[in-house]
Amino acid sequence: MDNIYNISSDNFKTLDSKLFESEKELQNLTIKYPELLSLLSESESIPVLISDEVRISTGRIDNFLVDNEAIPILIEVKERSNVELKRKVVGQLLDYASTISNDLIEMNFEEEIISSCRKHSFDENAVLDNLYQNYEKEEFWEIFS
């Protein structure tokens, strides 16, 4: 594993790695720090949480987010890392992606975002401003759907 360092003008320290205690801990970190997800792409967009624990006909999505390019992001968190489990998770996410648009057709996504902001103590105005920085609200949700 590569090391991660904390570097300041007068200090250089290797950060210790630590396993997550539970799936929920990792799931909560992706909610609290969605900017970590933007490190995985070339986009500078910070994803916005639509909702966590979203029930659909094929299961339950751990975290459902969207970036400011109107690209949906589905997160499924698993504790262990092995080849068979990775295959299962990929299949699970493909099932979710194929059914989500039909299952959530009645969902008011902006209301869900506001509800999630309140649940997790985020500034809903700042979150929505971030979300709509590239498109007007109506255009954004048209692209999203």
How should each PLM-predicted stretch be described?
Residues M1-S145:
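Charged, terminal alpha-helix-loop-beta segments
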